[in-house]
Amino acid sequence: MKIEGKFTMKAPIQQTWDFLLAPGTLVSCIPGAEKMEAVDEKTWEGIVKQKVGPITIKLNFTQTLTELEPPNHVKAMGLGSAVGGAGTFTQETIVDIKEIAGGEVEIAYSSNVSLVGRLATFGERIMRAKVNKIGGQFIQNLQDKLKEELGK
């Protein structure tokens, strides 16, 4: 399943980059995130809890940054499993940040997600709707947190 989009924010590119890559940012912006810990400079482990269809799923995952071109490009690979054996997932995400007019940045993202097990039985339509909803919440949270950070 491929999910992609882009949005703009009024923020300096370097501060946006630093903010996006801070583990504390991710845990505060991802809906349902219960934990996010840095394993090393390029790897995070986390737990996210989400309601999908009729069930609530808790996911353990590891995210590793595989390409870094500060402050414009990052590629990350993720691997996770649902607590209780409801399935596994893999994910590859690319985020590109570029400066545009008026002190704004454009953040473009593309993510390929593969689901196996009970997670996959919900079907792409249900999963895509859920992922899009979470993505929208993440973007709003990110914009709010970055505005708050810039105001300090």
Please give the residue ranges for each predicted region:
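Hydrophobic/aromatic beta-strand elements that line small-molecule binding cavities or substrate pockets
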Residues: 5, 34, 60-67, 78, ...
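Short strand-connecting beta-turns/loops that link adjacent beta-strands
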Residues: 12, 41, 70, 100-103
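Beta-strand/loop substructures that line and gate deep hydrophobic ligand-binding cavities in soluble
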Residues: 80-129
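A conserved amphipathic terminal alpha-helix motif
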Residues: 118-152
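Intrinsic-disorder/low-complexity, polar/charged segments enriched in Ser/Thr/Lys/Arg/Asp/Glu/Gln
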Residues: 2-8, 43, 60, 73, ...
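Hydrophobic ligand-binding cavity/cleft-lining segments
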Residues: 1-51, 152
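Hydrophobic pocket/interface hotspot
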Residues: 16, 20, 26, 65, ...
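Glycine-rich portal/gate segments that line the openings of hydrophobic small-molecule binding cavities
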Residues: 37-81, 137
